[in-house]
Amino acid sequence: MTRQYAFYFDSSACSGCKACQAACKDKHSLPVGLLWRRVYEVAGGAWTRRGAAWVSTVFAYNVSLACNHCERPICVEVCPARAYTKRADGIVALDEEKCIGCRYCSWACPYGAPQYDEQAGHMTKCDLCADNLDAGLPPACVAACPLRALDFGERAELEARYGTVHVVYPLPDAELTQPALVMTPHQDAARAAHEPAWIGNREEVNAE
């Protein structure tokens, strides 16, 4: 592998408009039920009564997530059809013609990135808009974000520019697959580690 492309996401800038999600769906003509990029609406805190007053400790932030093109992609390891490959540029590619639709990759991926297309009978996933990259263009989701909360590039360059945070709630431990994802956390993300927090749109993003 000569490089590792990665996504960058700035949770502190994201408004939750889901333009990235819509742009991805439009570019790849995804059917109903498939979302290669999903925006998780995280909420937490509570209202507590203090005497005659009610005090709010409520917080909320968004996490936009697609395939993280992990450095240790578990989908590549578990696929019995060898339909997945890790390209020299770090992109985890899926050969849909080889895929037998067993869904092992979907069950194994801690991010739920591979998604089953009921009509086609095989798995599908984000390819980092490889055709756009070949044409010198950014991924559709990155180009669509009105607040520039998304970026992409080589992982080392993104880390040098934005820092080395790779996980916030509700994402799993980065050590599992070493995701090629760099993040700027929302100011309230640290609270989700020690206060009650939940995904507010769990059904929409198909979160387990």
Which sequence ranges carry the predicted segments?
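Non-ligating segments of multi-cofactor redox enzymes
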Residues: M1-E208
